[in-house]
Amino acid sequence: AKLIAQGTASEPIVFTSNQSAGSRNYGDWGGIILCGDAKINVPGGEAQIEGGPRSYYGGTNDNDNSGILNYVRIEFPGIPFQPDKEINGLTMGGVGKNTNIDYVQISYSGDDAFEWFGGCVNAKHLITLGTWDDDFDTDYGFSGMIQYAVALREPNIADVSGSNAFESDNDASGSTNLPQTSAVFSNVSI
């Protein structure tokens, strides 16, 4: 399946809380999860996505196309689905390089804003605002390139993990599984 969310600068697509304006808060809803077929570094090459009990990602197709997210705002997402398994603002598992992600803003996420679990999708023009946890989190062999990103952090907002602009792991156990996480971020302001 693919998600096609093709907005414009003057008419962005907005995914937001179902609460009325003024009552919206961090984690009002889960977030967006994309599951692709690109390489990840877990044994067997496939894994269950956090927050998707029946959804799997990973494979051998680095040319995977999981859709288009252009001129998109994701507001008030990010929930703990289970202990240590959260839904982020935008969760990408094994998403390949033919996926188009450009001009995406995530605001007031109750967990990470963007998290990549493997895959090799490239993305440009990413903005985070007031994220509770990490702004950009890379795991499981993610090897994409991110260019033009801005993270605006609230100085008094953080979850119990400490929250950072970046978190990058090869995997949760610190293995040397291949492909190793090797994301490239350029033109970033924190």
Model segments located where?
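Beta-strand/loop edge motif enriched in small/polar residues
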Residues: 1-190
